[in-house]
Amino acid sequence: MKWETHCHTVYSNRRRRRFDALNTPREMIEAAIQKGLQGIVITDHDSVMGGLIGRKTAKTYAGFQVIPGAEITSRFGHILAIGVETDIPKGLPVEETVEKIRDLGGISIASHPYSTRVKPSLQEQCLKTDGVEIFNATSSFLANLKATSIAQTRDRPTTAGSDAHWAKTVGHAGIICDDPISDIRKGRAILFGEYTTLWNRRLFNLRQLASIATNRRLSGSVKLSSDELSW
């Protein structure tokens, strides 16, 4: 099965003061199916709601699976919690975040550990998680290279993900396996991926800006800030 392991839906927006993602779980599922995927892990920021709704929605699409999860904001960087169904508090130390993910039956993956656009980034603390995202479609080549180097040197399980915040880029990266949680942990997942182009990232920003402007206009405020853009 071909899986997307890192994507966001509108339920990321409930935890962040901006339009972090643009599409519903159903829209992400339909986009993934069109691109030939058989499953996605929905990893909204600090919320499992999108994943739970996505899993229920996926039942109407024969042969397609959704695994709930979240991208947890730990004290020192982002950690994917794959296979959890309960929210985990943000701001905890890496070790405590990983422990809570394990207690909930999930697997912890260091998200883009050497990214320069997401701060703080885990960097060497990625070795405290169950696995390392060595290819993130929105990260730089150098950031992915650093993640690959440390993971391979320390023999850590690895993953890839698109980090999609809208349907257009879902499936840019991921893994091929039967059971993501088990196969990642055992190092059996086959990685695939291509970089999200600068054009797609800028187009997303324009859509995001339009959504923010519409919301501000309805609320009586039209002042926009560039730091509200995700990428």
What is each residue range found by the language model?
Residues 1-17, 30, 52-53, 61, ...:
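Charged catalytic cores and adjacent phosphate/nucleic-acid-binding surfaces used
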Residues 27-46, 107-109:
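Divalent metal-dependent hydrolysis catalytic cores, especially in the metallo-beta-lactamase
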Residues 37, 64, 106, 154-156:
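A short helix->loop->beta-strand "cap" motif at the edges of active sites that frequently abuts
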Residues 45, 113, 137:
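Flexible loop residues that form catalytic
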Residues 45-50, 72-73:
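Short active-site-proximal "capping" loops at secondary-structure junctions
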Residues 63, 101-110:
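Short beta-strand/loop segments at the ligand-binding rim of alpha/beta enzyme cores
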Residues 109-117:
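Aromatic-lined carbohydrate-recognition surfaces of secreted/lumenal glycan-active proteins
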